[in-house]
Amino acid sequence: MLFKKSKAIIAAALSAAVVSNVMVATVASAAGTRTKPEAFGEDTYAERFLSLYDDVVTNGVENGYLSKNGSSSSAFGIPFHAVEEVIIEAPDYGHETTSEAMSYLVWVAAMRDNIAKNMTDQVDEGDLQYTADLAKAWATMENMIPTVQDNFWGGQVSAQYCGEYDNPEDCPDLHAADANKTASNPIHSYFTQAYSGQKGLYLMHWLADVENWYGFGSGTDFTFINTFQRGEQESCWETVPHPCIEERKYGNPQRGMKGIFNRDTEVAMQYAYTNAPDAEDRAIQAVYDANRWGVGDSNVSAKAAMMGDELRNNMFDKYYQTIGESTSWTNGNAGYDSAHYLMNWYTSWGGALASSGQNWVWQIGCSHAHEFYQNPLAAFALIQDADLKSGMKAQDAVKDYTTSLERQMEFYLWLQSNDGPIAGGATNSYKGRYEAYPSGVSTFYGMMYTEHPVYADPGSNHWIGNQVWAVQRLAELYYWVKTEGNTTGVKPGGMELDAALEQILDKWCAWFVNNSVLTDDGDFYIPSNLNWSGQPDKWGGSATDNTGLTCTITGYGNTDFGCVASLANTLIYYAKAKGVESSAIAGKTYDCIGSTAKAGIVDGVTGGSGGTAIKAGDAQLGEASLYLAQQLMDRVWAIGRDDIGLTRTDHNGSLARFFSQPVHVPSSYTGTMPNGDTIASGATFLSLRSMYESQSNCKGVQTTQEAIDLVAELKAAYEKDVAAGASWSGNNSASSDAGKAELADFTNVGAVELQYHRFWHAGDALMALGTFAELYPEMVPTTGSEVGPTDPTDDVDPNGLLGDVNVDGKVTISDVLLLNKNLMAGETLTAQGAFNADVDQDGTPTSADALNILKYTIMIITSFPV
């Protein structure tokens, strides 16, 4: 592999911060410096997939990705959100897991089976065996399906109305459950009739404490927990973690933990779960892929079909009210008039524990739908794949998914901005309280446009991951429709399915090709954050240009490898569906990408490449997409490959909230966490999680010393910033101008180096590598000569300054850059420059010399020759 170690460090040294609360790269001491041999080599994309999979899954327990919990001969260990513990995103602790992580495990296992069975000709190293990992991964994922669902099939489910909160401080005093407003799920009986032999819903709860760090469970056992409860302004930093099974063992003796969120003087012993349907859909997508690749498992397909069938619970309004612009309350339910047919943010369900002597159960849907939770590919799979279609046993499943496929596609057509990226979503319940819609707001089948559905701290549609996750599914669906056909009969917006997909993808891919950056030193940048302006046109049955809906790039990044890989995956499927051959990208260079990239957002990125912007419909768009995909994946591998996976040093100024974020606890409530931490008014994020600071505060699994040391380092940095005048008020969203300004002052916190190995990052990287191997088996990773050209006509002074590659009389980072360009891009060196570059004096300037010159510039070494 060309110049891997030095290129990684050089690229990292050149990168710079975008904004203080967005993670960005810096000098990496470990990233990109793999010392172990690759288990299956790295000369093909199949080999790279297998070598990375060997690190992340096969040896996942040893390398820290997987827990020992759950591991057996028929299942993998349960994946953590990340190898590292100090990471605050949607999980508030890195060794929690999510339904998202579980679904990625299923997806990568399906691809592993595919490569092991069908691509042995692409693998020359290692002992490749077919191990039927799909079934093992699905068995692992089933840990996220709750087994405690007492009486859920036997009871009459109710949905008692409670308005959503504008701010966490409003809970629970401002709104309470209203017994006079009670609804019910209109399709609950469908599932009781079809699946009464099951313990309850075959859906995943979204979050679990893998080794019982919080202590709500037993020992170090896997334990279901929850966090978010209190409306759109409740960030992860403002949550109170609590168990899904409430037995009043913790918190308050009479009110348990749930008493924080309601007004009950004595909380009943109960269970409660919430799903995140994009995870179930990703697992179904994986099974569909496996069936297409000939590595499916009939038992897994049957379970995926049942899961998909029951995922129709996510097609309904929160309280089963009519979808429309002037919804008024109706007790009972509005039947299918309450179905929006989109994938909403969640369905939640629960009931009394049998030990309580009570037998009530409840369920709610969700009125809010976000663009990035949609998965038309999963809907297509459930009605197009024979095994999945026949496996859905409940009434009207195929009918509902046919409608849902068309509705989801129309949702994307409606939300696509004039620029290309997809805007936020829609709701049937303004402010979560069925209030009157604002005047002039755009609507979609009676639902109002929402710029940032569900969450506002930070706004839920700023992050670029929403774009690449959502549109990957569209690109893959486009490929399957083009190659295998479509018998669903749907016509979104009056268009054939492939035409609708093409319209969305052409515009979206052109935007990313024009706004991504490939640098001549081997680095890259993609848009990382977007701001939104305007709204879509009112949906009238067909797509419009949405000239009043635009987005603006507010940040570029190069550390979010999961997003980068998902973008690459999208572009690969798009190019293949467009009929692009690998030979079409021969001779392309990095400056064909990024013609309209904005200047000044990233240091060293001066703006567009100067080329002509590629437009939707241009013949070269597919070629540029494939080229960009390959460059991104090859550069990620070169920059980020280390001994356990892929990573790049990050920074995150928003970690200042670790030590300053107040967490609302009602004045009427006092209690204790399992480890004795006090729950009362005045609590902070850290006061409820003192396990981050001391192992003696742990009741379940102990925090590692490495994590404790990192928190101490962050705290010392925070205290320096506070002494210099920095302050986090706790009153602003991190994505608001005021919030950004406050966090920008925490420069010392933002300077702390963070190294992350997120499981989903590895999952997206694996899928992009596997997709290359599947769709373009003839393509191999780009390589280059270890020796660059020189001009032999120059005279050489044998006493020249070693390290001075540009012959300007000093040794600086510019010399590293020039040698890097020489080795990677063929830029000519003078003969004197080549002599000076050979700092180990072995006769040839190589990547080892570039690395040593870099070490000299940052004073790791102090003299030459080396």
Kindly give the residue locations of the regions a language model identified.
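General structural concept
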Residues: 89-149, 153-176, 264-292, 298-301
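A recurrent domain-boundary module in secreted/ectodomain proteins
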Residues: 754-799
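Extended ligand-binding clefts on enzyme/binding-domain cores
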Residues: 62-71, 143-265, 274-278, 299-761
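Short glycine/serine- and small hydrophobic-enriched flexible loop segments
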Residues: 106-117, 285-293, 380-384, 472-483, ...
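Hydrophobic core
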Residues: 14-22
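Bacterial N-terminal signal peptides that target proteins for export
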Residues: 2-13
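N-terminal module-boundary/linker segments of secreted carbohydrate-active enzymes
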Residues: 30-136, 294, 298-306, 359-368, ...
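Cellulosome-associated attachment modules in secreted, modular CAZymes
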Residues: 25-29, 786-866
